[in-house]
Curated annotation (Swiss-Prot):
Protein name: CDP-archaeol synthase
Keyword Oxidoreductase tagged: no
Organism of origin: Halobacterium salinarum (strain ATCC 700922 / JCM 11081 / NRC-1)
Biological role: Catalyzes the formation of CDP-2,3-bis-(O-geranylgeranyl)-sn-glycerol (CDP-archaeol) from 2,3-bis-(O-geranylgeranyl)-sn-glycerol 1-phosphate (DGGGP) and CTP. This reaction is the third ether-bond-formation step in the biosynthesis of archaeal membrane lipids.
Single GO BP term: glycerophospholipid biosynthetic process
Signal peptide as annotated in the record: none
Catalysed reaction equations from the record: 2,3-bis-O-(geranylgeranyl)-sn-glycerol 1-phosphate + CTP + H(+) = CDP-2,3-bis-O-(geranylgeranyl)-sn-glycerol + diphosphate
């Protein structure tokens, strides 16, 4: 597979994990997952991690995977690339894993004294990818092995931070986020 094909497959395969956190920001709010509880004088997660945001984010990622499966034949023909279909387990684990990764990073932020919205370089950009891929590898190891070869994984690791900063910058410019990272 050439470089363009590798990038296309990497982005396609990760879209169900890329979308959930954006959807959670747009539709979040409501009751915090941690219920306001603290550990060592610091909130466990903070007000930014809510049940509604997690549910909406996960649903958005799954819905996108369903849509991508429907579009896959036409997209593959148009792009000239073999695109992976998402098995149901991958749909759920990519989307939910992305949310869990972001929640875990929030927990780490609080434990290290960072406030909500504070920058946490590398962790902020890759937390959701690591957990989404790990959960998906547990659920559908053959699919992950077939889809995420080394070139695709490297592409995901390089592209994700740039995409993360770009989308957060756009959300900040639109007034949806309080900080651009």
């Amino acid at each position: 597979m050439d470089l363009v094909g590798t990038v296309v497959v990497a982005v396609w395969a990760m879209l169900p994990a890329y979308v959930p956190n954006n959807a959670a920001v747009l539709a979040g709010g409501g009751r915090p997952i941690d219920g306001g509880r603290s550990l060592g004088g610091r909130r466990l997660l903070g007000d930014g991690k809510t049940w509604r945001g997690t549910a909406v984010g996960t649903a958005a990622g799954v819905a996108l995977a369903v849509a991508l499966n429907a579009l896959r034949p036409a997209a593959a023909d148009a792009l000239g690339v073999v695109l992976p279909a998402f098995p149901p387990a991958a749909m759920g684990t990519l989307a939910f894993g992305a949310m869990v990764g972001d929640i875990a990073a929030s927990f780490l932020k609080r434990r290290t004294g960072r406030q909500r919205g504070a920058a946490f370089p590398v962790v902020d950009q890759l937390d959701f990818v690591v957990v989404a891929l790990a959960l998906t590898a547990l659920a559908v190891p053959a699919w992950v092995g077939d889809t995420f070869g080394l070139p695709v994984l490297v592409t995901v690791a390089v592209l994700t931070p740039a995409l993360h900063l770009l989308t957060n910058g756009i959300a900040y410019a639109l007034g949806v986020k309080d900080e651009p990272w």
